[in-house]
């Protein structure tokens, strides 16, 4: 039979373990998040290597990037177009421009967010992306919201214990 104090301590240990596990997962989730605020627009980007879509032996690597655009201003804004600059570790530069994102030109109200995921392939094991969105306020004024530069890196190899 266990002593009541032991059960209490065991319960506290378990709660501490759950809390630290939760905290570590949150920190790992956000360790690769890049943020930038410009013109009252906060842009957060989290890149993710897609091993299942990559073919390393053919020097073909694919990354997804998860983007959140938050309107910190007082007026609604519409995302009109995007501009990306992608540079791989071989120095090859690619520029991508187009209307909206993922086929949409979202209007984002003050305090609201728009989230989407897209991706890019590289013929090298790493690269860097940066860019901007052309935004338009409801009065027709256009301005740029800068996208933070972020790196596209292969995940660290994991060690097998057995």
Describe each model-derived feature in a short phrase:
Residues 51-61, 74-75, 107-109, 122-124:
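Short, solvent-exposed beta-strand/turn "edge" segments of beta-rich domains on protein surfaces
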Residues 69-73:
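Asparagine-centered strand-capping/turn motif at beta-strand->loop junctions
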Residues 41, 61-63, 67, 114, ...:
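Hydrophobic core residues within well-ordered beta-strands of beta-rich domains
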Residues 96-124:
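Intrinsically disordered, low-complexity Pro/Gly/Ser/Thr-rich segments with frequent PxxP/GP/PP motifs
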Residues 123-162:
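Terminal connector regions
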Residues 33-59:
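Low-complexity, acidic Ser/Thr/Pro/Gly-rich terminal tails and inter-domain linkers that flank the onset
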Residues 76-94:
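Short acidic, flexible loop segments centered on an aromatic residue
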């Amino acid at each position: 039979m266990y002593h009541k104090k032991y059960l209490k301590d065991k319960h506290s240990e378990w709660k501490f373990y759950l809390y630290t596990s939760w905290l570590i997962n949150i920190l790992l989730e956000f360790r690769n998040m890049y943020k930038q605020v410009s013109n009252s627009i906060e842009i957060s980007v989290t890149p993710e290597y897609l091993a299942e879509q990559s073919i390393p032996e053919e020097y073909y690597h694919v990354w997804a990037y998860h983007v959140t655009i938050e309107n910190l201003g007082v007026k609604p804004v519409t995302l009109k177009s995007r501009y990306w600059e992608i540079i791989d570790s071989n120095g090859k530069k690619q520029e991508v421009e187009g209307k909206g994102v993922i086929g949409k030109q979202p209007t984002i109200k003050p305090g609201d967010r728009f989230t989407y995921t897209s991706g890019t392939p590289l013929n090298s094991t790493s690269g860097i992306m940066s860019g901007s969105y052309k935004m338009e306020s409801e009065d027709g004024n256009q301005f740029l919201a800068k996208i933070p530069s972020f790196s596209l890196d292969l995940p660290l190899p994991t060690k097998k214990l057995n």
